[in-house]
């Protein structure tokens, strides 16, 4: 027996979920105050906890990623891939171009600009094995970067997106993190169990968004300081930048998905394509083509080995593993709640196979091309043209490394200005979608594809802004980075429950197909 919502002909109006809202608001306020008032103690404490988690649960993170990869492959290539996320009469709300643009924009964020140059160069100079700065180190650096930005992370988004979309649109449960646990807990998901899951999802999402806002602010400030050296790089500049970014992000959230986030995603993708094409054509084009082919081959040939590699027999490399691979797996897991929920929100009417392949392959291809082109351009300058200054800058100020790279290409002042604009737009989409999902999780009622009241979206946007400014001014940004990684551990358990619950529901459906129900939806949003 599925949720009693199946029997309802109309949906109740959207209203605040007091338990989820207040528990989340109070929790993030306490965390924020601790980080602001005691920045050094918070940093030391979280760093110690993170080290213990990495040491004790590194193997566990690896297994969760591998299990997720296998499960998502089964979703895509078995008969269950034909099952739609919705009823037979449901059609996709967004066309393929807009849909794929939103998939990409929500899942990537500004980190692609931050790490596109910095990560490959860092691996090249400080590899886990062997000597840095060599030809072998260059080849392995790109392979490691492909690993961290490759399909391992995207399957987590696909898993959460498909699972939430299935239970929301196929089983008529709320579009909330709790709903995927219905096969395990039954009607108890509408009580304390569900409130706790949604509340933790909000906390993890806010911490992730604050971290994203911090990265965005650092890149923006670096770009503005690069373009205008006389502009003072002070706390006031940082605060003004954060407020401006969040004002526009709030506006897109208020406008909604159709008019705000969808439009931004299209602009975002076009700007990124233009920048990628510019670097490809004005850089060492033939070298970059060779690099893309070879990097892809290296990634595929080491795929299985590196998916399981814990550097058991090389203790010197375990620190690198914790700082990079385990960090990335935990980061992807921590981002999965809100990105997956957003993917579910925009994927009603599409089949499971469509969503899995769309999420895992379309953004993946662009991401790997970006890492390859920017990374190989930077490494080529260091390895073959003696521009060690790029490497030094990556170690000292990674946010500035992209702007330094552009100096070796034509029209660099103008392109640097465009990068600042791209940075601003690229920041907006994940923050906008994340804020919308937080507001939806802290409300109840309405249909599965309706959104929360505008005032609730504005509230969470303001809360994220205040927490971000406080943390950045207190110098606690690195503490927040540690916190977002730690959020990955408890949510990884929820991912395992998601796989079990979805497999159970799909098995039941293949044996006894879902009876289509026609409901009259009463909109309570906007």
Swiss-Prot record:
InterPro entries in the cross-refs: BCCT_CS, BCCT_transptr
KW GTP-binding (keyword) present: no
Spans through the membrane: 18-38, 57-77, 94-114, 149-169, 201-221, 237-257, 273-293, 324-344, 355-375, 418-438, 458-478, 483-503
Topology, Cytoplasmic side: 1-17, 78-93, 170-200, 258-272, 345-354, 439-457, 504-526
Record topology, Periplasmic segments: 39-56, 115-148, 222-236, 294-323, 376-417, 479-482
Location relative to the cell: Cell inner membrane
Disruption phenotype: Mutant is impaired in osmo-independent choline uptake activity. The betT1/betT2 double mutant is completely impaired in choline transport.
Family: Belongs to the BCCT transporter (TC 2.A.15) family.
Protein name according to UniProt: Osmo-independent choline transporter BetT1
Provenance organism: Acinetobacter baylyi (strain ATCC 33305 / BD413 / ADP1)
Encoding gene per record: betT1
